């Protein structure tokens, strides 16, 4: 009998009481890992634990709002107290406070940054501290977003946090390499409670709710699917099979898998003495013509047969 790839491993998944995080936790458990569920609500966390235990897996709950060091420490201690060790951290916890720039308050900005960006920082730091002190060649997986890669209207706070996470991952990979620890970002594209309210995705959501596969346009052309479509990538990155992969941003959704490039110049020009205003005014238009980058994710037209119902 083939041994499960994560047998004997212990994973923390932040924000795993429901949604994407729960799907990640359930798949990690299915592949043999013992899992620490994290949520801010005790009942939600307990239900998530029960869903894993009912399938023969091992899980415990740590109820804490991710962001501060105290929560990160509680998660690490919870893993070690329950299962004796820690091998994998999946940073998934997040909140949304979507508003256009002039309507976004300091509180809207700070909360999203605290949970996503600071929460990733504190949880990774305390997990890596454990890895270093105990000689564990562990796995760090943080969740990014297409919004962090491309930008999106009304999500200044979220875009900043998710872009920052990918930047931190590249730095973590450099700092952790000698310890044998890998750090990667996953960019998921999957149905959530939010996408259910967007008419563009109506036919995909309806198919999923009927237990049917989403139309190929969504799964293939958009790379849009279910949480389960992303969970396999999370589990693979957590395994020994992915020990050579670090510092990467990898997208998953529907039938599509994407490896994102690091930011790289598309135009490089030199001018002796540097680039003054006058030199730029004279040459920049020609140098940048056809090379300026777009902002936001571009959606292909929705086929006629997949148009949302009217009324």
Question: Residue ranges of each PLM-predicted region?
Answer:
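Active-site helix of classical SDR
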Residues: 124, 161, 169
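Canonical Rossmann dinucleotide-binding motif of NAD(H)/NADP(H)-dependent dehydrogenases/reductases
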Residues: 4-36
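C-terminal helical subdomain
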Residues: 207-311
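Active-site-adjacent segment of SDR/Rossmann-fold oxidoreductases
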Residues: 23-24, 30-31, 150, 166, ...
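Residue(s) in the substrate-gating loop at a strand-loop-helix junction
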Residues: 145
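The beta1-alpha1 cofactor-binding region of Rossmann-like NAD(H)/NADP(H)-dependent oxidoreductases
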Residues: 42-43, 63-74, 106
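Substrate-binding pocket helix/loop in short-chain dehydrogenase/reductase
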Residues: 100-101, 105-113
């Amino acid at each position: 009998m083939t041994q499960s790839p994560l047998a004997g491993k212990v994973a923390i998944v932040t924000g795993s009481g429901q949604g994407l995080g729960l799907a990640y936790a359930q798949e990690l458990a299915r592949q043999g890992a013992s899992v620490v569920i994290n949520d801010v609500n005790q009942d939600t966390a307990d239900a998530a634990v029960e869903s894993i235990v009912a399938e023969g897996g091992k899980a415990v709950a740590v109820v804490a709002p991710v962001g501060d060091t105290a929560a990160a420490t509680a998660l690490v201690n919870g893993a070690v107290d329950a299962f004796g060790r820690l091998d994998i951290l999946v940073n998934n916890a997040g909140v949304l406070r979507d508003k256009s720039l002039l309507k976004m308050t300091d509180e809207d900005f700070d909360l999203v940054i605290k949970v996503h960006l600071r929460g990733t920082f504190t949880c990774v730091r305390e997990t890596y501290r454990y890895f270093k002190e105990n000689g564990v060649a562990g796995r760090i997986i943080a969740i990014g977003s297409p919004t962090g890669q491309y930008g999106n209207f009304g999500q200044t706070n979220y875009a900043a946090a998710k872009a920052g996470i990918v930047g931190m991952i590249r730095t973590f990979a450099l700092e952790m390499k000698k310890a044998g620890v890998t750090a990667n970002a996953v960019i998921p594209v999957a149905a959530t409670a939010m996408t259910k309210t967007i008419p563009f995705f109506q036919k995909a959501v309806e198919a999923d709710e009927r237990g049917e596969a989403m139309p190929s346009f969504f799964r293939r052309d958009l790379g849009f699917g279910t949480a389960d479509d992303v969970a396999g990538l999370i589990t693979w990155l957590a395994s020994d099979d992915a020990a050579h992969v670090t510092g990467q941003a990898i997208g998953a959704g529907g039938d599509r898998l994407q490896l994102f490039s690091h930011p790289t110049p598309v135009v490089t020009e030199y001018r002796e003495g540097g680039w003054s205003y006058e030199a730029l005014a004279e040459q920049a238009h020609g140098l940048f013509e056809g090379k300026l980058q777009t902002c936001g994710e571009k959606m292909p037209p929705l086929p006629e047969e997949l148009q949302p119902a009217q009324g």
